[in-house]
From Swiss-Prot:
Binding site for NAD(+): G220, S221, A222, S223, T224, G225
Species the sequence originates in: Salmonella newport (strain SL254)
Stated family: Belongs to the aldehyde dehydrogenase family. AstD subfamily.
GO molecular function, one term: succinylglutamate-semialdehyde dehydrogenase activity
Record's keyword annotation contains NAD: yes
Catalytic center residues: E243, C277
Protein name: N-succinylglutamate 5-semialdehyde dehydrogenase
An individual GO BP term: arginine catabolic process to glutamate
Root EC class: oxidoreductase
Amino acid sequence: MTLWINGDWITGQGERRRKTNPVSAEILWQGNDANAAQVAEACQAARAAFPRWTREPFAARQAIVEKFAALLEAHKAELTEVIARETGKPRWEAETEVTAMINKIAISIKAYHARTGEQKSELVDGAATLRHRPHGVLAVFGPYNFPGHLPNGHIVPALLAGNTLIFKPSELTPWTGETVIKLWERAGLPAGVLNLVQGGRETGQALSSLDDLDGLLFTGSASTGYQLHRQLSGQPEKILALEMGGNNPLIIEDVANIDAAVHLTLQSAFITAGQRCTCARRLLVKQGAQGDAFLARLVDVAGRLQPGRWDDDPQPFIGGLISAQAAQHVMEAWRQREALGGRTLLAPRKVKEGTSLLTPGIIELTGVADVPDEEVFGPLLNVWRYAHFDEAIRLANNTRFGLSCGLVSTDRAQFEQLLLEARAGIVNWNKPLTGAASTAPFGGVGASGNHRPSAWYAADYCAWPMASLESPELTLPATLSPGLDFSRREAV
């Protein structure tokens, strides 16, 4: 029984699904997808639970969310292992994901009050009050790269705001989704407030096409995000928050500390085996001897990175990709760029055929035409050389995406120029592209999102504002508008 609908664990009636470890092929989870009828049942349960949940005092909703945080802390080791085994990422990184989930609770509570709490301004004849109301029933689509943390970033603020939810994890990480939902169950969520439906494309389409949804919160690829945007077009009454991918540039100017620049680049491009939406995909390096030295050192150090199993000791910097198919896709993208005329600086290599272990690849594409503007979700870094900083910014903006952008430079004026001219939601200076502050919004423009950033701003798309002018007494104004006559006429 792998679906949780209206407080009950039930068996899916759709396609049979099996999840294996992407490196060892060990079977981790088996179950059946939710069919369309079960997806509709989950929506009905959420709709029925909404009136009571939204009328609960905020303190009551907060107490359940904080109980969930305590359960995450108590089961940190267990959830860490589930995430690591299911995604293939090393244990150390999976542990940081669970820590981020725990920290998200307090941050979301603060963000609720700061962004969508109640504010009152006293007027001479009453008060002006701003309140926020939940949308109702929301669908949450989770990704596979951070199967605990990223859905958590939608679920927690949505529940705090008073919404009820249907959660569909990625079909590649059903075990993590189920494990997290069991902690919510233990936290005491009332039946129907949060429902779990497992499945792939058919389940997702059944969920997103429900007429009774009030909105959809999505983290994933641009292609799926665009499909959802088209599907919900003509329905302005539904909130749609899309957090999609990026083809992110990292600009390397002349720097004295080459090793520090190489370290920042490795953290930007290859952490999580390149499976972060903010990962650097395009490396823009200034022409000249210093740029040459930087690239040589980058190839040297990156060439020593050896992906390993989630539980290897000592721990590797990177583990496997989410699947052997994902690793193959990266290899095909590299070969495609070679065929276009790219010059391989570091060839990616499958560590073991049939597994998702893949070493990093680096390819130079300066002057190469028709390079696809796409997000290759894995450890493949494309390099361009530039002559001057204006050209670097032009190259950086030469993408339909707009998630993250970074600069490695000691020149503050260059960063100020980048802030003015970069088209990206995240612009970092001498910091990895993959670093983000939880007290700031997280999201992008263009093909990276629809102007609904998450993290600190997630509260914004989980509730709508309600403005009120109010007074406890009804009085006739001392001064009336022109043309109004309230004089008493004597009866004839």
